[in-house]
Amino acid sequence: MPRAASAATAPGGEGARLRWKLDMVLGPLVRASEALVHHPEIVEVYPRFLCTSHFIIRASVPLMETARERALALPAGDPVRDPLASYLDEHIPEELHHDEWLLDDLEAIGISRASVLRRVPSPTVAQLVGAQYYWVLHYHPVAVLGYIALLEGYPPSPGLIDELAGRTGFPEQAFRTLRLHGELDQGHRDELDAMLDGLVLTPEQSTAVSVSAMMSVDLYAQAIEDLIGEIPARG
């Protein structure tokens, strides 16, 4: 989960600049994540967090497939077309079935797949994911990289996962997805940052990627606050 960064001079590459911008605006998400991890009713909060994560992650592959289609529809001479489509071609298979992992984790704590799939995602989750479709379909598919940079850029540490496991008392299976993302996302983050550094973006495209990323910080933080708000702390 994200941690706050200190101010510094913006670096030069596209990926490094985006990461710098994200680090500067992470405060709301850091605070929401800390409130989740340290919530006195974590046994009730954690399953809701897994459900919310499932609602978000089950949309990732369809969203990236849409972005790939839109990238391939760009003019052949567009300098973003081929590297963006190639990146998504490679990354989509890496993200397959992660939503199923979360359903497995929830089953490990007694919550059935059917009950999760019946739940209505919050309006905030719909905004978080739906905004990306707007950027991809009505502006430029490169904007989705800002969203991916946030979701895969701040994996949970082993220590944090151990703390959650200890405080909830849930079986290890309930933390499988968190642990796998903790292992995988650092590599995914580095790959994305390097790819962004190699892109030739217009100033407008660079702005779209940044806005996509930064609005996602606020909406993801709000999604966590929403689920915490369902369970007032007792005592």
Predicted regions and their residues:
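Non-heme di-metal
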Residues: 1-235
